[in-house]
Amino acid sequence: MEAIAKHDFSATADDELSFRKTQILKILNMEDDSNWYRAELDGKEGLIPSNYIEMKNHDWYYGRITRADAEKLLSNKHEGAFLIRISESSPGDFSLSVKCPDGVQHFKVLRDAQSKFFLWVVKFNSLNELVEYHRTASVSRSQDVKLRDMIPEEMLVQALYDFVPQESGELDFRRGDVITVTDRSDENWWNGEIGNRKGIFPATYVTPYHS
């Protein structure tokens, strides 16, 4: 994933990475610490404060969705429909789930010593570049399957727990409530609505809704 720096940051430790406002950083790992992400800039890797950046929003990035939920989501979609998610078996890595003619297939996104991403031979500086390339080149070696965006649709989720707002602008709900997600560009806090009530809520409090 890629992110845009919102502020300048000067490293104060050897494992941190300095950057300037508006620079584009490649995010390598968001899982170990929600406050510090591992990133790369100009061939250098290090930790960066997550509140100093803004993730570039992509509809195909679903974050911590399970393999099973990815299959449910893609099973009735058109051929080539896809999403990228955080790997369940290897946290910090990514998987590409794609609707193929014979069902949903999952491809592990590999990474070399230079942190370049690849599925087969051609390597890329970012997930964004990998996705764009495979819009015109098959992701599969056994059949011709090119990536195509899912037709946009509202995402429904169901509350796993009660949520009582602590700040204005947050959405109150009870366990079992069904919420329409209107924006999930932030990994931790999503925008949603229940009836005519709108607000933000913690993404960890909900699960994909299956009627």
UniProtKB/Swiss-Prot annotation:
GO MF term set: epidermal growth factor receptor binding; phosphotyrosine residue binding; sevenless binding; signaling receptor complex adaptor activity
One Gene Ontology biological process: positive regulation of ERK1 and ERK2 cascade
PANTHER family: PROTEIN ENHANCER OF SEVENLESS 2B
Family: Belongs to the GRB2/sem-5/DRK family.
Quaternary context: Interacts with autophosphorylated sev via SH2 domain and Sos, Dos and Dab via SH3 domains. Binds to tyrosine phosphorylated Dab via the SH2 domain. Interacts with phosphorylated Ack.
Keywords noted in UniProt: Membrane, Repeat, SH2 domain, SH3 domain, Synapse, Transducer
Keyword RNA-binding applies: no
Tissue-wise expression: Found mainly in the developing eye and in the antennal disk. Also observed in other imaginal disks tested and in the embryo. Expressed in Johnston's organ, the hearing organ, neurons (at protein level).
Membrane topology: Peripheral membrane protein
Top-level taxonomic group: Eukaryota
Upper taxonomic lineage: Eukaryota, Metazoa, Ecdysozoa, Arthropoda, Hexapoda
UniProt keyword annotation of Membrane present: yes
Protein name: Growth factor receptor-bound protein 2
Location(s) in or outside the cell: Membrane; Synapse
Species: Drosophila melanogaster (Fruit fly)
Reported phenotype of the disruption mutant: Embryonically lethal. Loss in Johnston's organ causes scolopidium abnormalities.
InterPro entries documented for this protein: Grb2-like (IPR043539), SH2 (IPR000980), SH2_dom_sf (IPR036860), SH3-like_dom_sf (IPR036028), SH3_domain (IPR001452)
Effect ascribed to mutating residue 106 to Y: In E(sev)2B mutant; ommatidial cell development obstruction
Protein function: Adapter protein which modulates signaling mediated by several receptor tyrosine kinases such as sev and Ack. Required for proper signaling by sevenless. May act to stimulate the ability of Sos to catalyze Ras1 activation by linking sevenless and Sos in a signaling complex. Required for functional and morphological integrities of the scolopidia, sensory neurons and the antennal mechanosensory and motor center (AMMC) brain neuropil. Required for Ack-dependent suppression of apoptosis in the eye.
